[in-house]
Amino acid sequence: MTFQELGLNEPILRALADQGYEQPSPIQAKAIPPALTGRDVLGCAQTGTGKTCAFASPILQRLSEARTPDHRLRALILTPTRELAIQIGESFAAYGAHLSLRHTVIFGGVGQNPQVEALGRGVDILVATPGRLMDLYQQGFVRLEDLEIFVPVSYTHLRAHET
């Protein structure tokens, strides 16, 4: 199976090739086709299996096929940690390199002004941690009325229990 057979468009195929992707992983092969049609997908897989690509590439394709000139927020990816938010933001930048969509990442622990400025320029995709999302939403900098896609990202942290 190839990424082309999954139904991804040429700009995304080119970006995946730029990143060294040759063929889809099992989670990508199962998740991408239904996600491209707008169906809800719940995916679970180990670290390093390509989960981010499995949800990011269909989001990028769906939004690029129905572009809006004003870059309204249409996809929200909610992640528990700053580190994961940054990683997912980097993936959106890489997979969307040949598209005209805008994304930004917001998280706490840093000044909010650069994040507010990025939101003010308009974004199609927002990757956020819950605390900063709520802060900027309550201040009126994040508007959700045009939201089409919501992806809650979580991870499982395993730790040994003392006996």
What are these regions (language model features)?
Residues 30-97:
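Conserved P-loop/Walker A NTP-binding site and adjacent catalytic elements of P-loop NTPases
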Residues 6, 15, 19, 34-35, ...:
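Amphipathic alpha-helical segments that mediate coupling or scaffolding at interfaces
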Residues 2-42:
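Conserved pre-motif I regulatory segment
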Residues 130, 154-155:
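Walker B catalytic acidic pair
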Residues 139-148:
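Short basic/glycine-enriched coil/helix segment immediately N-terminal to the Walker B
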Residues 127, 151-152:
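Walker B beta-strand of ABC/ABC-like P-loop ATPase nucleotide-binding domains
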Residues 71-135:
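Conserved nucleic-acid-binding Ia/Ib motif block in the N-terminal RecA-like helicase ATPase lobe
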Residues 156-163:
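Conserved small/polar residues in nucleotide/adenosyl-binding loops
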